[in-house]
Amino acid sequence: MANTTSRDPSSARTVARQRRARDEKLATRELLLESARTILRDGSLFDLTAISLGHQSGVTRQTVYRYFPNTESIFKALSDDVINAVYEDLQLPSDKEDALDHFVTKAIAVFVSDSAVIRQLVLASAMGRATGSWRQVDPEDILLAVVTDIAEEQRPVSKDPVVSARMMITYFRGALYGWAAGFYSDEEFEKQVRLAGRLTDPDAI
């Protein structure tokens, strides 16, 4: 018996509408995030509000709230993009001898790629850290994974990966906050982060 079942046109139209709606939602979200970055580049974290974001992106305040119910959620979304960029293409676990250097190089490249914005995100996340609700813009979990994977003799300070990673992240945060506050240029920040990754004299780098 021949199969007479045909695809329901109304079902296909529904799928197409759902896809368009999903694409439009993603596009609007990205528009809002890029508009938020523009505000941060031109001003400070205190300039980023639902009103300013709506004005910059050309959407209503209600639309802004639909995607981001408060300013904190905007900062968290922007911070997630930074952390995801650090994670991207990072092969873990890795037994390569240069895994730590590769990670440090990748992290530096991400942070200075849009330093005017990311400096503001670091300050915002530091201000909200006490509440426990803002995601900190530092890759501590990634660093621990990298240090755990490398050979014991290559771990700075201690063979214990937790101790080694904790020491490096302490140095890294010092460099990060100094850079975010404007005490370090991008080049000086890179030098200090490489110091954190090797725990050596920065003048020897």
Predicted segments — roles?
Residues M1-A16, A145-E152, A181-I205:
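C-terminal peripheral helix-coil segments that are non-catalytic and often amphipathic
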Residues M1-Q56, S73-K76:
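Basic, helix-initiating cap at the start of DNA-binding domains
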Residues L40, E72-V82, S125, R135, ...:
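Alpha-helical DNA-contacting segments of helix-turn-helix folds
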Residues F75, V110-W134, A145-T148, Y177-G178:
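Amphipathic alpha-helical segments used for helix-helix packing
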Residues L78-F103:
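Amphipathic alpha-helical linker/stalk segments
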Residues D101, T105, P161-I169, R173, ...:
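Short, well-structured alpha-helical segments
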Residues G128-T170, R194-D201:
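Amphipathic alpha-helical packing segments from all-alpha helical-bundle domains
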